Amino acid sequence: KKFTVYAMICGYLHDIGKAYIPKEILTKDGPLTEEEFEVMKTHTTIGYNVCMRDLKLRPYADGPLYHHEALNGSGYPSGLTQKDIPFVARIIRVADEYDALVTPLTFIFLIH
């Protein structure tokens, strides 16, 4: 039960860094340029820093930081492989991918 609550809070916080990404990038109609994608990718480290600045959020910083890592090392921000990616981040990655598949983009843009 303890891990479930921990994972739930990490999940709630996983995209907190997007609050600091320019709205023009978050709501862009069409694919991002390489430069825009590099800016978008910073939401992971920004989210980590937000959590680390708050003692109550600090334990949950792995969710925002590692949720875009991939088992084969092709993810970001660190290019970690399976054994080095925290389990909670792997769970969030799967949930985030599922959400991206089933949530209409117009809804996503409205909440940012």
Give names to the regions the model predicted.
Residues 1-112:
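Histidine- and acidic-residue-rich, metal-dependent catalytic cores
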